[in-house]
Amino acid sequence: MINKFKKTIETSFEKKEHLKKCVDPLLKNTIISIINLLDKGKIRVAEKKNGTWITNQWIKKSILIYFCIFKNKLIISENMNFFDKISMKFEKWDHDDFCKHKIRAVPCSFVRKGSFIAKNSVIMPSYINIGAYIGENSTIDTWSTIGSCAQIGKNVHISGGVGIGGVLEPVQNNPTIIEDNCFIGARSEIVEGVVVESGSVISMGVFIGKSTKIYDSINNKIYYGRIPKKSVVIPGSLPSKNNRFNINCAIIIKKPDHETKRKIKMNSILHLNN
């Protein structure tokens, strides 16, 4: 079935400029099925295979086609209305649905359909876009945004006001990825397909894009687009080539030690679903 979906999407995407004129019912049903599979976590925009993250470009294309062929509709909430092409994930959920999926979502948490939230996750007032994947026992804290197709691992804490970049606008080749057991400090921004590898700690106010220098002060090495596993990262700067000014960078200062782990330890009480 997946291969059939993939073939339909690849063929349709090549002629996406003409899709609005006459939408093939098969394509429409295929897109709906793909969004539902994303919503349930059955498929993902990116997967780690043999230690390497692989982006399923056809799934990303499916989301773009969705925006192309579906019209805006009125989405009615108890206190506010919306006008969009994509429904909210919890729109038709009742008490039993939340208990079954073991998700805690507080008021003003906006989660678009087509994103997946694993069990024992806590969603504070925040925004999670279509195609995103949130692993088990993770927290998305207040006023954070998880961009389209971003991948968040297990036991991850995304602190208040954090921005995790999406891939749909501006169009990016690969999604931003936060691997398992990471902590992202308040008001930090991780964008443009950057990968934060497992066990890393990003301090408050760190801004990392694809072209941001990531200076490993332990090994005197420069990285781009990737935070090596088990790194503690703080904001900093490095001198320009002409030494006339400094350029923003991220600095790896150490590996997480006992004190670091104590400070960022997740509170299991907050993830109880009873």
From Swiss-Prot:
Known catalytic reactions: (S)-2,3,4,5-tetrahydrodipicolinate + succinyl-CoA + H2O = (S)-2-succinylamino-6-oxoheptanedioate + CoA
Protein name as annotated: 2,3,4,5-tetrahydropyridine-2,6-dicarboxylate N-succinyltransferase
PANTHER family listed in its UniProt record: 2,3,4,5-TETRAHYDROPYRIDINE-2,6-DICARBOXYLATE N-ACETYLTRANSFERASE (PTHR43300:SF10), ACETYLTRANSFERASE (PTHR43300)
Pathway: Amino-acid biosynthesis; L-lysine biosynthesis via DAP pathway; LL-2,6-diaminopimelate from (S)-tetrahydrodipicolinate (succinylase route): step 1/3
NCBIfam families the UniProt entry points to: dapD, PRK11830.1
Disulphide connectivity of cysteines: none
Recorded family membership: Belongs to the transferase hexapeptide repeat family.
Organism superkingdom: Bacteria
GO cellular component labels: cytoplasm
Coiled-coil regions listed in the entry: none
Residues engaged in binding substrate: 104, 141
Gene Ontology MF term list: 2,3,4,5-tetrahydropyridine-2,6-dicarboxylate N-succinyltransferase activity
Subcellular location: Cytoplasm
Complex and partners: Homotrimer.
Classification via Pfam families: Hexapep, Hexapep_2, THDPS_N_2
Alphabetical GO biological process terms: diaminopimelate biosynthetic process; lysine biosynthetic process via diaminopimelate
Keywords: Acyltransferase, Amino-acid biosynthesis, Cytoplasm, Diaminopimelate biosynthesis, Lysine biosynthesis, Repeat, Transferase
Class in the EC hierarchy, top level: transferase
Organism of derivation: Wigglesworthia glossinidia brevipalpis
Entry-linked InterPro entries: DapD_Trfase_Hexpep_rpt_fam, Hexapep, THP_succinylTrfase_dom1, THP_succinylTrfase_N_sf, Trans_hexapeptide_repeat, Trimer_LpxA-like_sf
Enzyme Commission code(s) on record: 2.3.1.117
